[in-house]
Amino acid sequence: MDATFRIRPDVAVIRSSEPVPGVGFLPVRSFLLLGSEPVLLDTGTGHGSDAFVAALESLIDPHDLRWIVVSHADGDHSGGLEAVLRRAPKARVVLNQVSTGKLSSTHTIPMPRVTWVNAGEGLDVGDRVLRFFRPPMY
């Protein structure tokens, strides 16, 4: 199975998985929005970060990545953050303040590279505006 596939010309999916003892693996998906300011939505689990970064690099030069949106602080969405940040020096991390606090206890978050967003806000990423919502369970 390929590590990446496209669902539109400007949207790619990066597959990863989280080991679940006694069950197998939890499939996890991250999304790369290609455009004038490319956006990575979530960074995978952190298990197999090298493979995740290699999959990302098969789609884009990480130096061209401008935004890394972390949907929430759970490890299956944020585990690969540090690995991606090392390879994407121009990318800003998009988080809410609660996720920033939670992730700061387990990750080194470069605060000068953080952009905070709140539910209901939009983020202009060049050729589109991303809107942020708080899901009912978070």
Regions found by a protein language model. Give the residues of each.
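Short, compositionally biased leader-like segments
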Residues: 1-6, 89-93
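Conserved beta-strand hairpin/beta-sheet module of binuclear metal-dependent hydrolase folds
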Residues: 2-57
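Metallo-beta-lactamase
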Residues: 6, 94-138
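Short catalytic-loop micro-motif centered on adjacent basic/acidic residues
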Residues: 39-42, 67-70, 131-132
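Structured loop/turn residues at secondary-structure junctions
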Residues: 44, 73, 135-137
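Active-site metal-binding motif and surrounding structural segment of the metallo-beta-lactamase
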Residues: 48-94
